């Protein structure tokens, strides 16, 4: 048998196997993000983000995957599920860039959708205490004393300028 044919055959087999390799973390995350952008494929996005987290739990994109899953849960009306996902993000990735937002969203969802005012107060206080330099800490400072009150009682709008 011709050694060149053997070499070319092996090269083709190796190339074929390489093209069937597992997607990179970035590729899998991008596929999930694309699915999440289409409201008709949210279940597909959930499966892809969960697959990403199973395969790459220590990847730098893992906290963002949990954040995206929480956002999808909110879109689907599963507010308790969203809180669970945000809590998971806080416990598994406490050093990530998403923690202040996750803590804030727990507070917001607990107040606005679940009616758990005590948990909302605690979550807003954690934003203030644990992330004092976050832009969301300023919002939490404003919202905390008003938890449970209707906005019309505490939101002050500037009077519209009056024509002379």
Model-predicted regions and their roles:
Residues 3-4, 16-164:
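Acidic, polar-rich low-complexity tracts and alpha-helical solenoid repeat scaffolds
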Residues 7-14:
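Sec-dependent N-terminal signal peptides
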């Amino acid at each position: 048998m011709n050694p060149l044919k053997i070499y070319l055959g092996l090269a083709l087999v190796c190339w074929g196997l390489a093209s069937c390799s597992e997607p990179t973390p970035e590729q899998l995350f991008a596929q999930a993000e694309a699915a999440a952008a289409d409201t008709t494929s949210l279940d597909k996005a959930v499966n892809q983000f969960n697959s990403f987290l199973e395969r790459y739990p220590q990847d730098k994109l893992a906290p963002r995957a949990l954040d995206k899953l929480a956002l999808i849960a909110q879109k689907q009306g599963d507010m308790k599920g969203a809180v669970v996902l945000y809590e998971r993000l806080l416990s598994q990735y406490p050093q990530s860039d998403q923690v202040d937002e996750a803590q804030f969203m727990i507070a917001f969802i607990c107040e606005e959708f679940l009616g758990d005012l005590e948990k909302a107060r605690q979550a807003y206080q954690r934003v203030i205490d644990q992330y004092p330099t976050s832009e969301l800490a300023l919002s939490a400072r404003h919202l905390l004393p008003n938890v449970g009150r209707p906005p019309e009682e505490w939101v002050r709008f500037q009077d519209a300028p009056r024509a002379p």
